[in-house]
């Protein structure tokens, strides 16, 4: 049965309670209202005594039910994810952008500025929706940024996002660096699949049921993608100056050791995120 509401406030109250009853986050109600009304959070608070337009009411109630009953992410319902203050198109073919990845991007930008690199060549491996590559291209004028992904569907989204933000990024389809070993890059950045298949049963349904498995899981206890990338780097004619990986919070030592074994000329740093969990490994050519 389709609920009806006398005001936006009443719609928020109904949705929050419905979501709580299904063990979902009540704040999803506000995110969906902001999307369907095209309002800011402050507008939602200031005008919550107004009536919800009929079409928005129907779409809102349907989206709340879908999220509550299936776990489908809000970003898939709205088609939008946020990263570094920008909106990006997302769907079931790409990972939803996550705040921890912003810290990886900040680390790369700090390196470029600290080293005073005027025209750095950067490649993002496993680019997905393109948020890393597009953000770096936008925030680092003069940089030459590329993105690679194995998924054609993901690359379609990345291309749309680059066009939306006016970012000059070249996208390639491939298995990480496999077809680009002759190309020189100053920086290689990647948020590869790093979750072990053994962790699947412990994960939230909003992730495991809706994010693409290709972007989540890796063999060898989540380390297979790092090994592939590092093997490819070892075969490059010109090694990068900097390698930046996002990692699982318990993988810091394992990934750092892999780098030191496969690229002994590198110095590695395990870096925590804002919550104090190991989330990044940076490697620099000595």
Protein language model regions, located:
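Conserved SAM/SAH cofactor-binding pocket of Class I
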Residues: 100-202, 228
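Conserved AdoMet
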Residues: 34-111
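Conserved Class I SAM-dependent methyltransferase catalytic core
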Residues: 220-284
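Mobile active-site "lid"/loop adjacent to the S-adenosyl-L-methionine
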Residues: 194-225
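Non-catalytic accessory regions of SAM-dependent methyltransferases
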Residues: 1-37, 42-45, 49
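Conserved hydrophobic residues forming the short capping helix/wall of the S-adenosyl-L-methionine
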Residues: 19, 112, 162, 233, ...
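Conserved SAM-binding loop
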Residues: 97, 124, 147, 218, ...
């Amino acid at each position: 049965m389709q609920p009806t509401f006398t005001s936006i406030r009443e719609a928020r109250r109904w949705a929050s309670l419905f979501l709580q009853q299904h063990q979902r986050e009540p704040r999803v109600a506000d995110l969906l209202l902001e999307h369907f009304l095209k309002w800011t959070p402050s507008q939602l608070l200031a005008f919550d005594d107004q009536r919800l337009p009929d079409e928005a009411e129907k779409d809102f109630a349907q989206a709340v039910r879908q999220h509550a009953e299936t776990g489908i992410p809000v970003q898939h319902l709205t088609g939008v994810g946020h990263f570094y203050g920008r909106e990006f198109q997302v769907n079931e073919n790409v990972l939803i952008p996550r705040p921890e990845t912003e810290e990886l991007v900040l680390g790369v930008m700090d390196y470029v500025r600290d080293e005073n690199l005027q025209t750095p060549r950067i490649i993002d491996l496993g680019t997905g929706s393109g948020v890393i590559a597009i953000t770096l291209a936008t925030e680092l004028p003069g940089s030459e940024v590329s993105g690679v992904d194995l998924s054609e569907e993901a690359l379609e989204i990345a291309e749309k996002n680059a066009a939306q933000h006016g970012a000059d990024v070249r996208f390639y389809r491939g298995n990480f660096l496999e077809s680009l070993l002759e190309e020189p890059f100053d920086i290689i950045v990647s948020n590869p699949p790093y979750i072990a298949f053994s962790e699947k049963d412990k994960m939230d349904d909003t992730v495991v049921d809706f994010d693409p498995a290709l972007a989540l899981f890796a063999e060898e206890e989540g380390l297979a993608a790092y090994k592939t990338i590092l093997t490819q780097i070892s075969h490059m004619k010109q090694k990068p100056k900097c390698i930046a990986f996002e990692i699982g919070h318990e993988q810091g030592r394992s990934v750092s050791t892999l780098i030191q074994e496969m690229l002994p000329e590198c110095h590695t740093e395990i870096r925590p995120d804002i919550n104090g969990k190991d989330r990044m490994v940076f490697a620099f050519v000595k």
